Amino acid sequence: MSINKKIEYQEVVQDILDNEEFKKLYLEPHHGISRYEHVLRVSKLTFGFCKIFKVKRISEITRAALLHDFYFDKDLEEYDAYEKLSIHPYKALDNALKYYDLNDLERDIIVKHMYPHTKKRPKY
């Protein structure tokens, strides 16, 4: 990623990365790394693909990618592994809404990123 794109990416997501609750994702294991590292990678890849393909609404899509797994394992202790697949997007959305005003696109991306486990198709 070029320095200009890195700067642009940082401007889009910095407020999320500075959030103390979001930083706690460092302590959550996810796919062999921390959940923080996972969502950071996903959002950087998303940003890069949006740039390559000249996708509109890049800021919203990138931010939703960063927030898509903003949940904690303690939130899902009562559920089995299969249930967690469809429930965790809603927990991520609930947590994101505590700190950020999200539009319909961002909400849709977060809640439906596990389609078809979430049963509803993505709207966008």
Protein language model regions, located:
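Metal-dependent phosphohydrolase cores
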Residues: 1-124
